[in-house]
Amino acid sequence: MLSPQDRQDKLVRATDLDALSCKYSINRNLYLNPPDEFVKDLVESYQRYLQYCVGYTGLSSSRALKGLFQEKKMPIINRGSYLRTRAIDQVVNKFIGEFKDRCQIVSLGSGSDTRAFQIFKSHANVIYHEIDFPESAKVKKLAILQNPVIRELVGTNETSPLINNKEQFESYSSELHTEKYHLHGIDLRTLKKPDSQIKGFQPEVPTLVISECVLCYLSPDEYQRTMNYWTEIADQNYMGFLIYEPMSLNDQFGETMTLNLQSRGLNLQTFSKYPDLISRKKFLEESCHLKNLRLTDMSYIGGYKVRQDGREWIDHKEMGRINKLEMIDEIEEIRLLLEHYCLIYGEYTEEKTLNFKGIDTWSWILS
């Protein structure tokens, strides 16, 4: 029988399956151009190994996966997933380009994300860290080792073992480390003081930390401690933070989102504590000591709000292509949904001459 904490952690880990199913859907429906060739590897790995994760059986894992991956996603969900993926990819690639590949990416709660593999195809020298719960990291590691293309991209000769039961899965190491790729099976809540837990981390190179709907599952205190951990480990060198997460806006739609999350056993404490861009900016500046903050919501990124300076996130030609894939009649509905998700960039550095100039390639609501 699972403890209350184990049950809660299982629910949080399950959100990675939600994200993967959304990525799978937009990939299948041709939103991604070029398509993501690695999504299927993560899906197949979950199909093999979810049954061995805490709280699952062969039957319950099969039901969970069938419900997520066989049901058609609504166009409004596909559009939001596309905008999220596209915007984050653009910032990450611009960061890598500006620092000419001599940089480091840290993806918190990376789970089934495939961004690292895409980046290695064109930026072989970037250092990439992925951190997630040990179980999630194991599923990802096994996906990597079962595909020779991904093995070559990350730089490992290790091959996949034979795992046929929970005991073998439980005893299997979640860690994978190469010269440029580091997969860490770590609960973020255990990162409290800078130490040797982050194998391969290089504090001397510019670093971008990504939290894509991850820190929002922590309490406000845990959120702040996690942010402070990374600013301390930066050792006064340049570190940028790219954060994507929901916010309540203290309105009726936000209340509906809260009830929906609670019905799934999820409690996003920062969702209402920092309900809008202004309160989040204050929290990140005053409690997390970030500077040069840029904040926007996904409605703005998607072009559902009027921009004054023309620095659009997605050009008209690309949006024209996307609009032809699936029709969305209720423009007000998607605008309202996207307003409740924010994208934030901030930086921590003691080096006054170093910053990420490319972040102003795009227009932001608040800076």
Swiss-Prot record:
It comes from the Eukaryota. One of its GO terms (biological process) is methylation. Gene3D superfamilies: Vaccinia Virus protein VP39. It catalyses: [phosphatase 2A protein]-C-terminal L-leucine + S-adenosyl-L-methionine = [phosphatase 2A protein]-C-terminal L-leucine methyl ester + S-adenosyl-L-homocysteine. The keyword Transport does not apply. S-adenosyl-L-methionine binds at R84, G109, D132, D187, L188, E212. Its EC number is 2.1.1.233. One of its GO terms (molecular function) is protein C-terminal leucine carboxyl O-methyltransferase activity. Keywords: Methyltransferase, S-adenosyl-L-methionine, Transferase. It is an enzyme of class 2 (transferase). Methylates the carboxyl group of the C-terminal leucine residue of protein phosphatase 2A catalytic subunits to form alpha-leucine ester residues. Belongs to the methyltransferase superfamily. LCMT family. PANTHER family: LEUCINE CARBOXYL METHYLTRANSFERASE (PTHR13600), LEUCINE CARBOXYL METHYLTRANSFERASE 1 (PTHR13600:SF21). This is Leucine carboxyl methyltransferase 1.
